[in-house]
């Protein structure tokens, strides 16, 4: 494949944009460096770069493009919205319609509020939980990414009795001291954290299905135990469904798993590809937010006409019967084929999959927590990534990220992907 135009544009980007990218996850630093491929357009399950190369896309903008790129129903909705003005700063009927659709899909949303990103949604749920409980500390799980606000950029201490440390320059130690980080799927360490700090903990922030160190499901009974322990100590449970909402089930991970949180944060996945976030939950908790309560949150772009109408159009598409069965069918086909190739070529790898999302980990061990994900072979993944890229398969440039299948993918796409996987394994 020729990447000369991508390389030339990236050289310009390096001169004009910090680090050459507008999000570190787009850099190829984690896969051995080099200029990231610059895309020109997306259509269905495919990307086309500035050199004219075509890719089967499994990045899907890190998950939200469930319908595939440039889905006509969503595109037309955005065009209609833009023709009537892109930003009002006033209420619109579309934000009411979209809120009602979210409430219908996810019953825990007794009240909902729109914001502009998943980071903003999570940040606000933490503020609301603190206001409601009158407490300051938060529990999060190791390796789970919840955006880039200070309170969630915190690494684990040496154990559940130890408070966190900053995971980024610029995060004050005083902020990190309000966060306890414990391993996902380890209910005993979770209980120990409450033993030490139970009357200080405002809320527990959890991805009900992990999507940020690959796809990792909770152990049976884990989320139920999280609810029980948190509520017995007067703490709230906050679900981060920025990745999981509408990806595995129309009602979100909480509906699929049958566990109800107190608050939920949403992000990119609900917006059909446009910037968006939302949070919601129990009415008595949400009424602590302005203008009804003393907890302040606002945003000029919140509930803007473009994002609202794109979100409505997205839900209209994916609510159709068979959406999730189709994603599961293609996911199973891809997983089965890859496992056969792993065995055929004696590749040291494991796959975690849930419906239309999966991760390949280069390790002999099944990954169930962040420590295990961190220990996987990053060099092997980097080689695999480059080999797949040169065969027209677009993946996230990180061993921690998932592959996302869309309703635009076909069985032929899966077969073509498996051919590329086999060619890659032959060279590893």
Curated annotation (Swiss-Prot):
UniProt keyword Iron, yes or no: no
Family: Belongs to the class-III pyridoxal-phosphate-dependent aminotransferase family. HemL subfamily.
Gene3D superfamilies: Aspartate Aminotransferase, domain 1, Type I PLP-dependent aspartate aminotransferase-like (Major domain)
Organism: Macrococcus caseolyticus (strain JCSC5402)
EC number: 5.4.3.8
Full protein name: Glutamate-1-semialdehyde 2,1-aminomutase 2
Major enzyme class: isomerase
Sites of N6-(pyridoxal phosphate)lysine modification: 268
Pathway: Porphyrin-containing compound metabolism; protoporphyrin-IX biosynthesis; 5-aminolevulinate from L-glutamyl-tRNA(Glu): step 2/2
Major localisation: cytoplasm
Keywords (A to Z) from UniProt: Cytoplasm, Isomerase, Porphyrin biosynthesis, Pyridoxal phosphate
GO CC, alphabetical: cytoplasm
A GO molecular function held by the record: pyridoxal phosphate binding
Entry cofactors: pyridoxal 5'-phosphate
Catalytic reaction(s) noted: (S)-4-amino-5-oxopentanoate = 5-aminolevulinate
Subcellular location field: Cytoplasm
Gene Ontology terms: biological process: protoporphyrinogen IX biosynthetic process
């Amino acid at each position: 494949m020729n990447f000369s135009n991508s390389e030339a544009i990236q050289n310009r980007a390096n001169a004009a944009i910090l680090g050459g990218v507008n999000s570190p996850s787009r850099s190829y630093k984690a896969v051995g460096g080099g200029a990231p491929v610059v895309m020109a357009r997306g259509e269905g399950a495919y990307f086309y770069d500035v050199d004219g190369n075509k890719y089967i896309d499994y990045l899907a903008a890190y998950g939200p493009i469930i319908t595939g790129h440039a889905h006509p129903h969503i595109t037309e909705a955005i065009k209609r919205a833009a023709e009537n003005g892109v930003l009002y700063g006033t209420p619109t009927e579309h934000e009411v319609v979209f809120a009602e659709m979210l409430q219908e899909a996810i019953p825990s949303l007794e009240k909902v509020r729109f914001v502009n990103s998943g980071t903003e949604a999570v940040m606000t749920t933490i503020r609301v939980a603190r206001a409601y409980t009158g407490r300051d500390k938060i529990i999060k799980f190791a390796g789970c990414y919840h955006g880039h606000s200070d309170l969630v950029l915190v690494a684990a201490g040496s154990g559940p009795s130890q408070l966190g440390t900053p995971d980024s320059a610029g995060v004050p130690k005083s902020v990190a001291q309000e966060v306890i980080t414990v391993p996902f799927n380890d209910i005993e360490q979770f209980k120990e954290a409450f033993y030490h700090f139970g009357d200080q903990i405002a809320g527990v922030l959890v991805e009900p299905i992990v999507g940020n160190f690959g796809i990792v499901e909770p152990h049976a009974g884990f989320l139920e135990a999280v609810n029980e322990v948190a509520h017995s100590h007067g703490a709230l449970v906050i679900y981060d469904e920025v990745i999981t909402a509408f990806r595995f089930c129309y009602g979100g991970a909480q509906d699929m798993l049958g566990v109800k949180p107190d608050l939920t944060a949403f992000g990119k996945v609900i917006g059909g590809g446009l910037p968006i976030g939302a949070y919601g939950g129990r009415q008595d908790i949400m009424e602590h937010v302005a203008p009804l309560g003393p907890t302040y949150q606002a945003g000029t772009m919140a509930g803007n006409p473009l994002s609202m109408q794109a979100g409505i159009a997205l839900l209209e598409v994916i609510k159709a019967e068979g959406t999730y069965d189709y994603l599961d069918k293609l996911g199973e086909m891809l997983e089965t084929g890859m496992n056969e190739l792993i065995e055929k070529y004696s590749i040291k790898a494991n796959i975690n999959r849930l419906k239309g999302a999966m991760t390949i980990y280069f390790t002999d061990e099944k990954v169930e927590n962040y420590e295990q994900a961190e220990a996987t072979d990053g060099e092997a993944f980097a080689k695999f990534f480059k080999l797949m890229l040169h065969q027209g398969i677009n993946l996230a440039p990180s061993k921690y990220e998932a592959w996302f299948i869309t309703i635009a993918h076909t069985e032929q796409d899966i077969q073509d992907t498996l051919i590329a996987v086999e060619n890659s394994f032959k060279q590893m």
